[in-house]
């Protein structure tokens, strides 16, 4: 029996890419590949890339450059680039990096085994088409899970065309996976020990199928015996339907956590971004969501230094942050992406963007620390995902997605326990198990 070939995957960017990497590993597993965490051991190295920011894209080329010595030492090593950089740059990757054997876009990775077979004869292959067929129809059934929490992609693509964003160009139009297939995949995950599922999509709350929206899907998933927790990400304010907001109050298995990007608090900048909503619309949404689920923790995304942003625009963003009170937020300086409308506009001075980002992050950090301190003394559910670094310690995620360290010598990965929070650190909480 021949020795199994080894596959190393490096994943960049969003949770969608984490899910895609798992599915690519499963597709190649059907061809005899097993995962390794050591690139030097691999027979194939696959970089699953992100194109949302310029630095993310350039990091891929830097990492490819670091693979040159390995390719020289192992000429039969196959190197592939997948994901959104692959979709955006295609043939250009082969021109810039002769060591790359194949380039596969996010809508084509079900064809990865066939592409790899073609490289065995020396061909260099690019497949960045948007096929008519559903790629999920051609992928093997999910058989492996890496813990009690799993991702499930329910929707791909985006039709919003925000002026700064490449997603509509790299991931295509919004497509919702069929309800029946999602239910079957979720049941399969639970049968393999998964207790928490996070529903994924570039614009996940745009999902619709068979007359259901995302709220209806969540209600049906919650009926699966053994599935204890549900989450979803990432959402657009314009697709927060009444049914979905109601689900936050009505469905106990839907965790009290919501990531709802707003990007700016200035209506003028929101219009320039083509966000199709106002700051007031966002604030009213937050009121309704909190009315449905008062204990919900909210997080968001912000871009500072968007072309044309004035000091007054930036102050409006700070005002919105103060008005909402976020548990955390991802914040970035504007990064022009080729092919997007905003890339044609003059950029702000770097020093202005740097100063604004520091001010925004200081405010968000203050809110994050306050939110975590407010958890001290409260009882929360924690799903253990791994053993801690200290003996007898377990680490898991709370209902609000905080990392929690618990002293629990009898604890096992997959246990869902009640914990009293005893202390707050900058990026995590500590607690004691109740009823042990």
Curated annotation (Swiss-Prot):
Record: residues binding [4Fe-4S] cluster 2:
158, 162, 165
Under the heading SUPFAM superfamilies, the entry gives: Radical SAM enzymes
Q: Read off the Gene3D superfamilies from this record.
A: Methylthiotransferase, N-terminal domain (3.40.50.12160), tm_1862 like domain (3.80.30.20)
Q: Which residues form the MTTase N-terminal domain?
A: 5-121
One annotated GO molecular function: 4 iron, 4 sulfur cluster binding
Q: Where is the TRAM domain?
A: 373-435
Domain of life, per lineage: Bacteria
Top EC class of this enzyme: transferase
Which compartments is it annotated to reside in? Cytoplasm
Q: Which reaction does it catalyse?
A: N(6)-dimethylallyladenosine(37) in tRNA + (sulfur carrier)-SH + AH2 + 2 S-adenosyl-L-methionine = 2-methylsulfanyl-N(6)-dimethylallyladenosine(37) in tRNA + (sulfur carrier)-H + 5'-deoxyadenosine + L-methionine + A + S-adenosyl-L-homocysteine + 2 H(+)
Q: Name one Pfam family in it.
A: TRAM
Q: Which GO terms describe its cellular component?
A: cytosol
What the record notes about the co-factor is: Binds 2 [4Fe-4S] clusters. One cluster is coordinated with 3 cysteines and an exchangeable S-adenosyl-L-methionine.
EC number(s) reported in the record: 2.8.4.3
Report residues binding [4Fe-4S] cluster 1.
14, 50, 84
Assembly: Monomer.
Xref: PANTHER family: CDK5 REGULATORY SUBUNIT-ASSOCIATED PROTEIN 1, MITOCHONDRIAL TRNA METHYLTHIOTRANSFERASE CDK5RAP1
Show the NCBIfam families listed in the entry: miaB-methiolase (TIGR01574), MiaB/RimO family radical SAM methylthiotransferase (TIGR00089)
What's this protein's family per the entry?
A: Belongs to the methylthiotransferase family. MiaB subfamily.
Its annotated function is as follows:
Catalyzes the methylthiolation of N6-(dimethylallyl)adenosine (i(6)A), leading to the formation of 2-methylthio-N6-(dimethylallyl)adenosine (ms(2)i(6)A) at position 37 in tRNAs that read codons beginning with uridine.
Q: What is this protein called?
A: tRNA-2-methylthio-N(6)-dimethylallyladenosine synthase
Q: Which organism is it from?
A: Cereibacter sphaeroides (strain ATCC 17023 / DSM 158 / JCM 6121 / CCUG 31486 / LMG 2827 / NBRC 12203 / NCIMB 8253 / ATH 2.4.1.)
